[in-house]
């Protein structure tokens, strides 16, 4: 108070006012504060002060030739004084107005191309719809989000090379454009920006926006795809939200969404195959997403999702060090534990062997619709603070945390036996058994957990076993909070290992991910996903399996035919026949297989019985492990279109129909391709026609390598010997004649010699 009086007193003297307003500031500390460094210390003041001057702008000397000294109103546009410390002229803001109205107009053709991201944004906003504003508490959590829609997914280094090549093609420096996307973009941009007058630096900045994903760690309550993030400031405040539907999709969001769907489908499918890891890699390498190889997208795309991370781990890429359980991402924020095997008894007296985490640890749990902070000790939940969109989401988080805590009362709450299996019909591990059990029904778990009195803490309420909020009581250690828990912000990636059952571990051996963690949610991909692998044939149902299996045989008929005669077991074990087995009734698979294999053996043994269509038709049935029986079949059943349909062993059926005249094969009425039979299979004079120009030397001789198909014979040099597969599926040794003159006699001798060679 005294000081204020003193100051008032001082100010009343006119001299004080004069000193404060007129004299220069000469205190070194103040001068230092405002003049050190390039950073402007008070930008808004500086701007106001500058604009109050007559000539606040400096411009290149050429301006004096292009802009008149005075405008129509007679106001001076530039000063004859040159700027101190540079050879530029001092210019009035009025000169800018004059230039905008009367200055030269250049071609605008390049603007939409260079500023593409801005033009696209305007279009999206124009077609977007803004709904009503709602006032309510916003539970925002910080998530790592993509902030520039419409970008390619190049790494910073790749983008830098592209930009240098497009904008500064003549600059020195090694630039290696290797990836498909780099080359395409460079070619496209060079064409678009020919004769572009916009400053190269600006073009470079804009290109960077188009090529590289930029992420920020922002508080978000709603959608996280980039077209929502660009309007974040319009759609959510501290206590309000505005509904918004974007006016267009962008490719980067589509890629992220389709990648997740493809990865989930692939992991689910691989998990049920004989060798999950090998199958997963085979599928990732043969899948295209929107025309781009899935493995290329995986290398560049930072999306973190359980299935995507399993695929990345399989490819040897680094992934985030957080782990997944029950659909929540767990990140340990403090503490440590050691793991020990322990046997526990459920409420049903079933013994479970669980890996117990001994020690005090704290975790953040982040899910799609709920987040939490979990503090736990050895087999004891100390505290869980959870927040979520609704009661259901909060309950999900509580169940996961209770199971994760490994508390005894949770294990004792199990009623009935635990025998959940995964898609491959293998028992789940004990922790996932418990999780599935309580996800189905958590009533007993919540009832047995225990209740406690609670203190009144700002922003926190208790929650009772029936999920109703309360300010007096709560389930032991559990509170519901208004504030969300931020996602783990670090973008650090760690080296991981993956076993053949797709369990991903960090270098300490902790399991980070497993197929059980992959969401079962089905979605429709926004970009076309092309799975070339036979394992994914079943994704479109039984009919697709049937058609694809036969198409595969027809496409590879030349090599299939050779294997059929030489190495049938290897052929029967081909993975392309695996999906087909699911169509054959389980009880009879083995008998069918035994029957077809016997039939094929007779074809190999008996001259003149080789039948292309019949082999193609029956081959998929021979792939199942055969049962020896004397059973004969005139038709084989496949389960398609919701019922059993028959394939006739001899003759056509709606399922498998071969038209001899058109040589077309139709499966279930769908065209499956052209089938070229061996020339005139009905007569046994086949070979003579085919083997003109070759001398038949006798039976197959393994020293001359695997049997060639008839088409491959033409590559032999004169005098060269080879084994060849002839019409009936028999193999003989031939030599290409040294002289052409004797070709005619071949036809007559061939038939005799073949009979001798085979018998």
UniProtKB/Swiss-Prot annotation:
The cysteines joined by S-S bonds are none
Q: How does it assemble?
A: Influenza RNA polymerase is composed of three subunits: PB1, PB2 and PA. Interacts (via N-terminus) with PB1 (via C-terminus). Interacts with nucleoprotein NP (via N-terminus). Interacts (via N-terminus) with host MAVS (via N-terminus); this interaction inhibits host innate immune response.
Q: What positions carry the motif Nuclear localization signal?
A: 736-739
Q: Which SUPFAM superfamilies match?
A: PB2 C-terminal domain-like
State the gene name recorded for this protein.
PB2
Alphabetical keyword list: Cap snatching, Eukaryotic host gene expression shutoff by virus, Eukaryotic host transcription shutoff by virus, Host gene expression shutoff by virus, Host mitochondrion, Host nucleus, Host-virus interaction, Inhibition of host innate immune response by virus, Inhibition of host MAVS by virus, Inhibition of host RLR pathway by virus, Inhibition of host RNA polymerase II by virus, mRNA capping, mRNA processing, Viral immunoevasion, Viral transcription, Virion
Q: What's a single GO MF annotation on this record?
A: RNA binding
Report what the protein is called: Polymerase basic protein 2
Coiled coil ranges (UniProt) are: none
Q: Does the keyword Metal-binding apply?
A: no
Q: What is its main location?
A: virion
Family the UniProt entry places it in: Belongs to the influenza viruses PB2 family.
Q: Name one GO biological process term.
A: cap snatching
Function text: Plays an essential role in transcription initiation and cap-stealing mechanism, in which cellular capped pre-mRNAs are used to generate primers for viral transcription. Recognizes and binds the 7-methylguanosine-containing cap of the target pre-RNA which is subsequently cleaved after 10-13 nucleotides by the viral protein PA. Plays a role in the initiation of the viral genome replication and modulates the activity of the ribonucleoprotein (RNP) complex.
Q: Mind giving the lineage of the organism this protein is from?
A: Viruses, Riboviria, Orthornavirae, Negarnaviricota, Polyploviricotina
């Amino acid at each position: 108070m005294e000081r204020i009086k003193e100051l008032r007193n001082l100010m009343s003297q006119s001299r004080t006012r004069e000193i404060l307003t007129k004299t220069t500031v000469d205190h070194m500390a103040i001068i230092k504060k405002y003049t050190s460094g390039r950073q402007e210390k008070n930008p808004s003041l500086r701007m106001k002060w500058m604009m109050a001057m007559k000539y606040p702008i400096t411009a290149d000397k050429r301006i004096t030739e292009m802009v008149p000294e005075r405008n129509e109103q007679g106001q001076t546009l530039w000063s004859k004084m040159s700027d101190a410390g540079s050879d530029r002229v001092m210019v009035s803001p009025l000169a800018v107005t004059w230039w905008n109205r009367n200055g030269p107009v250049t071609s605008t053709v390049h603007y939409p191309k260079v500023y593409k991201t801005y033009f696209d944004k305007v279009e999206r906003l124009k077609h977007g719809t803004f709904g009503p504003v709602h006032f309510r508490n916003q539970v925002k959590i910080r998530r790592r989000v993509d902030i520039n829609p419409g970008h390619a997914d190049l790494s910073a280094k790749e983008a830098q090379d592209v930009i240098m090549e497009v904008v500064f093609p003549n600059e020195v420096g090694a630039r290696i454009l290797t990836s498909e996307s780099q080359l395409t973009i460079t070619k496209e941009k060079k064409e678009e920006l020919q004769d572009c007058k916009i400053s190269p630096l600006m073009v470079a900045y804009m290109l960077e926006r188009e090529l590289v994903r930029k992420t920020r760690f922002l508080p978000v309550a709603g959608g996280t795809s980039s077209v929502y993030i660009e309007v974040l400031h319009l759609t959510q405040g501290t206590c309000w939200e505005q509904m918004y539907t974007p006016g267009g999709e962008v490719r980067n969001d589509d890629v992220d969404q389709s990648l997740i769907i493809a990865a989930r489908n692939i992991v689910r499918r691989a998990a049920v195959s004989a060798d999950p890891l090998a199958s997963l890699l085979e599928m990732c390498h043969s899948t295209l997403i929107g025309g781009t190889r899935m493995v290329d997208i995986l290398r560049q795309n930072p999306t973190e999702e359980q299935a995507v991370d399993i695929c990345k781990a399989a490819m040897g890429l680094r992934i985030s060090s957080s782990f997944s359980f029950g659909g929540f991402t767990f990140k340990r924020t403090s503490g440590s534990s050691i793991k020990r095997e322990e046997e526990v008894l459920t409420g049903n007296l079933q013994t479970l062997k669980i890996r117990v985490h001994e020690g005090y640890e704290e975790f953040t749990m982040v899910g799609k619709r709920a987040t939490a902070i979990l503090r736990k000790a050895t087999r004891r939940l100390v505290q869980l603070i959870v927040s979520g969109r609704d009661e259901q989401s909060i309950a999900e988080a509580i169940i996961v945390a209770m199971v994760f805590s490994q508390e005894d009362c949770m294990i004792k709450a199990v009623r009935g036996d635990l025998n959940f299996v995964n898609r491959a019909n293998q028992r789940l591990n004990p922790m996932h058994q418990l999780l599935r059990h309580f996800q189905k029904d958590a009533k007993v778990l919540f009832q047995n957990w225990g209740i406690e009195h609670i203190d009144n803490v700002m922003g926190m309420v208790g929650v009772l076993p029936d999920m109703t909020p309360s300010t007096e009581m709560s389930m032991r250690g559990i509170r519901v909070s208004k504030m969300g828990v931020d996602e783990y912000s670090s973008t650090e990636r760690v080296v991981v290992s993956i076993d053949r059952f797709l369990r991903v571990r960090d270098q300490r051996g902790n399991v980070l991910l497993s197929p059980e963690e992959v969401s079962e949610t089905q979605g429709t991909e926004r970009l076309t996903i092309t799975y070339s692998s036979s394992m994914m044939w079943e994704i479109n149902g039984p009919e697709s399996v049937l058609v694809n299996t036969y198409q595969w045989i027809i496409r590879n008929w030349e090599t299939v035919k050779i294997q059929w005669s030489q190495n049938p077991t290897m052929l029967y074990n081909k993975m392309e026949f695996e999906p087909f087995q699911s169509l054959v009734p389980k009880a009879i698979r083995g008998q069918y297989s035994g029957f077809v294999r016997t039939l094929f053996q007779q074809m190999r043994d008996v001259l003149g019985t080789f039948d292309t269509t019949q082999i193609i038709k029956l081959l998929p049935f021979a792939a199942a492990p055969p049962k020896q029986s004397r059973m004969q079949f005139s038709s084989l059943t496949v389960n398609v279109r919701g019922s059993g349909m028959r394939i006739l062993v001899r003759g056509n059926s709606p399922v498998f129909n071969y038209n001899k005249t058109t040589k077309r094969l139709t499966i279930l009425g769908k065209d499956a391709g052209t089938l070229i039979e061996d020339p005139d299979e009905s007569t046994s004079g086949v070979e003579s026609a085919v083997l003109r120009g070759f001398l038949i030397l006798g039976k197959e001789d393994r020293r001359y390598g695997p049997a060639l198909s008839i088409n491959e014979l033409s590559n032999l040099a004169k005098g060269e010997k080879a084994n060849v597969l002839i019409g009936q599926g028999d193999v003989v040794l031939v030599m290409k004649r040294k002289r052409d003159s004797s070709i005619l006699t071949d036809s007559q001798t061939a038939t005799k010699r073949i009979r001798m060679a085979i018998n």
